[in-house]
Amino acid sequence: MLLVHAHPDDETIMTGGTIARYLDEGVDVRVLTFTLGEEGEVIGDRWAQLVADGGADQLGGFRIGELTGALAALSPPGGSPVQPWFLGGAGRWRDSGMAGSAAARHPRALVNAGFDEPVGVLTDILESFAPQVVITYDSAGTYGHPDHKLVHEVTAAALARVAASRPEQIKVYESVTEHSALQAGLVAAARRVPDGWRMPGPGELPSYPDAMVTAEIDVRTQYDRKVAALAAHATQVTVAPSGTEYALSNNIVQPIFGHEHFIRVDAAAVAGPRETDLFDGIG
């Protein structure tokens, strides 16, 4: 299984439980991250001077440590933890920041990479690792981040190249939030909003209609490890005292889900009951 993400913390927020579950099942799980997340907004004062804009520009290196800690938390206790893996090597491409930010003008920003280069690097990884399942973002980049959208596009292009030479079908999934799961989580969260946090406004958190979701993975057994992994990304994520919600630097309440949701998008996807195992149908 290969999970393709843009920045450290995306892997845990979107797919942390799924990573932990399949590691528990003995699957060879690799987490590939495109950038170091140099443009992340730091929570609190302790590490605030690591930022790029007006600071030491050391946040990316620090976040490698956070990602390492998060993957260790997601890994089965007593075993060898999953190690971070960066496209082109750590630091090859840089976090582009949000749309319209000055960070997008940096010469190493991911959005300035010639499209063929990251596609070629990812194609080589797909050919050498030969995953049976690939997980990434939807075409909107989950919430519109330019790097997330580019990761989606690069992944789709690399998969298309591999399909031309590899007869085995790769199951491809986009990680999404199910609408009813989000609403249920927010109803529960409204009873325990931490001081200084706020509930999201209507439509502020993206979600998909339930009918579009094709796979639902039960990660309740791995839930505590997912929470620990979120806490490992301390510059970016605050976990509520209840352990049931988290917030980014904007202090907007977001539920921590015990089920993670996906939409299958490869050519062999067919309508039918929701999958409960992403390896269904793989011999």
From Swiss-Prot:
One of its GO terms (biological process) is mycothiol biosynthetic process. Its EC number is 3.5.1.103. It catalyses: 1D-myo-inositol 2-acetamido-2-deoxy-alpha-D-glucopyranoside + H2O = 1D-myo-inositol 2-amino-2-deoxy-alpha-D-glucopyranoside + acetate. InterPro entries: GlcNAc_PI_deacetylase-related, LmbE-like_dom_sf, Mycothiol_biosynthesis_MshB. Keywords: Hydrolase, Metal-binding, Zinc. Zn(2+) binds at H7, D10, H148. Binds 1 zinc ion per subunit. Gene3D superfamilies: LmbE-like (3.40.50.10320). It comes from the Bacteria. GO terms for molecular function: N-acetylglucosaminylinositol deacetylase activity; zinc ion binding. Its cofactor is Zn(2+). Belongs to the MshB deacetylase family. Catalyzes the deacetylation of 1D-myo-inositol 2-acetamido-2-deoxy-alpha-D-glucopyranoside (GlcNAc-Ins) in the mycothiol biosynthesis pathway. HAMAP family: MshB (MF_01696). NCBIfam families: mycothiol_MshB. This is 1D-myo-inositol 2-acetamido-2-deoxy-alpha-D-glucopyranoside deacetylase. It comes from Gordonia bronchialis (strain ATCC 25592 / DSM 43247 / BCRC 13721 / JCM 3198 / KCTC 3076 / NBRC 16047 / NCTC 10667) (Rhodococcus bronchialis).
